[in-house]
Amino acid sequence: MIKRYLSKSLTISLRKPKRTSHSACILLLACWAATLPAQKISLDATIYQGSIWRHSPKLTTQSGERIGGQELGFRFHTTGRRDWQAWQHYPAFGLSLGHFRLGEGSHSDAFALLPHLSIPLFQTGRWAAHFRVGTGLAWVTRPYDWFDNANQNAIGSHWNNITQFRLGTEFRTTSHLRFSAGGSMTHFSNGGSALPNFGVNVFSGWAGAAWFLQPLKKEDFQPAKTSKREVLRRFGGQIQGGLALLEIASLDGPKHAVWITSANGYFQINRINRVLLGMDYESNRAIYEWGLHSARFRDEAKARQGSTRLAVFAAEEFLFGDLSIVLQAGKYLGKNINQFVPKASYAKLSARYYFPALLGTEMKTFAGISIKAHKFTAEYISGNVGLSF
């Protein structure tokens, strides 16, 4: 079942939920479900209090007011049944339903389905600290509308991506009950698939409680049987192709393709960590069409040149079994290309699922999604397929 879902190519246009937003959600859930060999489950409840950050002077959406949110979910806690779980200090995979009351001046309410990964940072006695990252699907009740909601320009569609980073400490009171608190940043955006798309960034504090259906004891954690330093091959490469859909310049206008290709080499630090160095190439049809129709490019040759984007990037890939998270930073380069880029540099956050090795070799295909941003504004969300060798 998982392979059947993952074999479908993914294009993300959050304005069209029946076709692509559902595909993105299926991919995220399939990646998450494929990495759940653990048996220890906790039920989690969280409340949030924070405010929307005014990250752009062009933002007309209300910001700075106190807002709140709630979250209910569950986590599967790994116990070392596979060596990588011990190497990664026994992470937890979870799924949550969330709600943020953004306010009447800020698109009203946001409801979210959020798969997430919790990574332990340290544990001593009854205390522990965790970092959590998640990305999923959100529904915003009152997006921008030319007739009914023209004064709120952060989000231009009902369907959006939600990406959240959360840091917190946890205190174990009994074998079943734990309390936690910390801080978080939650981002809502459609990745430019529907304008306007400045996005909503919520910075908040949070407090929560977790009830373990079965006690999670120290003796439940199995040590790794092998060393994470035993790497068969230190150097390798990856190639990847992707597709995103964008609106540009005109609200409710046509959507244009952004074709993305990347190639990189990598150095395998250990069996759960890689450093990547490579190049990104993009053919941005949104810039091409907009530049021609607005006479910013005098002919098709200039339009092709101006809509080409080339960049070098460095990245780090964190491996969790067949799932990985890639943090990437890039810088544009080249003369007479990269026209109309918002900034000189960008960042990407990617999630990948690796399929079994091909024909007994080291080669593995993968599928995933990426969100690309210039500072705190997302440019696009893409679906990707690639090969690691």
Regions from the language model: what does each represent?
Residues L72, N201-Q222, L349-A351, A378-F389:
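Outer-membrane beta-barrel "beta-signal"
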Residues L43-I47, F93-L95, F131-T135, L167, ...:
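Membrane-embedded beta-strand positions of outer-membrane beta-barrel proteins
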Residues I41-T60, R81-W87, H107, T124-F171, ...:
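Outer-membrane beta-barrel translocator/channel fold
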Residues Q39-K40, T79-Y90, F122-A128, T173-L177, ...:
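Short loop/turn motifs that connect adjacent beta-strands in outer-membrane beta-barrel proteins
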Residues G64-Q70, H89, H107-L113, W127, ...:
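Residues that define the transmembrane beta-barrel architecture of outer-membrane proteins
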Residues I47-W53, F76-T78, L97-G103, T135-T141, ...:
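Transmembrane beta-strands of outer-membrane beta-barrel pores
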Residues Y90-T141, A209, F267-I269, N273-I337, ...:
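Gram-negative (and chloroplast) outer-membrane scaffold detector with strong preference
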Residues P57-T60, F100-G103, N149-I155, N190-N197, ...:
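Extracellular loop and loop/strand-boundary signature of outer-membrane beta-barrel proteins
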